[in-house]
């Protein structure tokens, strides 16, 4: 891979950056903070839901770890169930859920902790095309309404163009270009970005 997931893990605190590398949250250097101190939410491609817990318990897990009292946990979980329209799934186990339902539970669990930043690692890859398109719109609308900063890793160009306010194109562990979707599409800085993002007319010249 080009390093997308590794970069996400560094931001989360699961891996350390190379010497000199820093992770900054809103002007605060969090490079030395442990993951539990960074207050990040994470949604993985595999969802990483706990099979021994029901939906309600999965959503409340991060709150329990943060030692919120029972009423706060119940209130926040209820809020998430309503927000994600999965109230009727509260007591189902994970193996009783469809792919789309698991995705909603994983997102609810990540948002429940009110993270400073939400990290999503190709969360829609395992879903069929129709469901993927629908959830893409739902996630975009939800995160914008909540005002949550999100970093969304994807290899799908159309997904990046549809969701991103700013896009980072990576190749071989390095950043090839950073910019708005429009800027990257119309003004690619090199051949790799042009090839990756859109259809191009390439003309050789002297």
Language model features by range: what are they?
Residues 12:
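Helix-to-loop junction immediately C-terminal to a conserved catalytic motif
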Residues 15-17, 64:
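A position-specific signal in ABC ATPase nucleotide-binding domains
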Residues 46:
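Serine-hydrolase catalytic-loop signature spanning alpha/beta hydrolases and amidase-signature enzymes
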